[in-house]
Amino acid sequence: MTQRPLLMIPGPVEISPAVQAAHDGPVPGHLAPDLIEAYRSALHDMRALWQAPAEAQPFLVPGSGTLAMDMAAANLVGPGDRALVVGTGYFSDRMAEILRRHGADAAMVSAEPGRPVALEAVKERSEEHTSEL
């Protein structure tokens, strides 16, 4: 077996040998019974993992984290809605930009790099910038 470099980035992520082996097989059709059952099982397991009620609908997003962030913004905010983003680095900056692209008035509260965002600062900023999200 050939050694490959260890990924130490936010994504894509390392996968187990079993998952890699599954990828080595033929690509199933989107209506294949085995794929439908695997999808149903994954949704069931997600509900159990998150202790979600039966009526909750989890989603498997076959895309990047940015796609999931964009989906959340598209479904949670509209033009003129206000949102407060706690700035913790690159991905929170990206979330604020995505919210703005969906028309939201996104405010940020941050701290110096390497420092935590103070809870009091979040409270103060949320009082100044009352937000729907």
Role assignments for model-derived ranges:
Residues 127-133:
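Residue-level detector of conserved catalytic or cofactor/ligand-binding positions
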Residues 44, 55-88, 92-96:
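Conserved beta-loop-alpha segment that forms the PLP phosphate-binding cup at the N-terminus of a helix
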Residues 2-4, 53-56, 78-82, 102-105, ...:
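Short coil/turn connectors at secondary-structure junctions
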Residues 39, 62, 66, 115-119:
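A conditional alpha-helix N-cap/helix-loop micro-motif detector
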Residues 85-125:
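Gly/Ser-rich phosphate-binding catalytic loop and adjacent alpha/beta segment
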Residues 4-62:
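A glycine-/small-polar-enriched, mobile loop at the entrance of the PLP active site in fold-type I
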Residues 42, 46, 72, 122-126:
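Generic hydrophobic alpha-helical segments
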